Amino acid sequence: APPPVGDQAGGRKVNCSKYNAKGSQFACSRHLDPVCGTDHRTYSNECMFCMLTQNKRFSVRILQDNNCDIECTQYSDMCTMDYLPLCGSDGNNYSNKCLFCNAVLRSRGALFLAKHGQCESP
């Protein structure tokens, strides 16, 4: 089955039009009120979230207020073999944060962290 999209993927949609009053220019304050996107990146506030996600190839929503539990900002395609398991919302185990973050990217933000550690066996 394809990964869930839209509301099924979790997160809330943001009305970004309130931040770009002057055409397509965003006027964001430096006020720190972090939010975590469904791309597992922490943005300093909702306005910065809107500005930095407007040109993404997929729709990013706000997963939670505050910093992300798992930060996927700086990961390459090449992952180490470290073993620090994470359980994804798809029920799959990911050996480490790098592999999980690459899966988040491939899922276009539909995958999120279910829990730290391995998923429960059926």
UniProtKB/Swiss-Prot annotation:
GO terms for molecular function: serine-type endopeptidase inhibitor activity. One of its GO terms (cellular component) is extracellular region. Residues 10-70, 71-121 form the Kazal-like domain. The keyword Amino-acid biosynthesis does not apply. Its main location: secreted. Keywords: Disulfide bond, Protease inhibitor, Repeat, Secreted, Serine protease inhibitor. InterPro entries: Bifunctional_prot_inhibitor, Kazal_dom, Kazal_dom_sf, Prot_inh_Kazal-m. It is found in: Secreted. The record marks 30-31 as: Reactive bond 1 for trypsin. Disulfide bonds join 16-50, 28-47, 36-68, 72-101, 79-98, 87-119. The keyword Disulfide bond applies. It holds the Pfam family Kazal_1. The record marks 81-82 as: Reactive bond 2 for elastase. This inhibitor is composed of two homologous actively inhibiting halves: one which inhibits trypsin, the other which inhibits elastase. This is Double-headed protease inhibitor, submandibular gland. It comes from Meles meles.
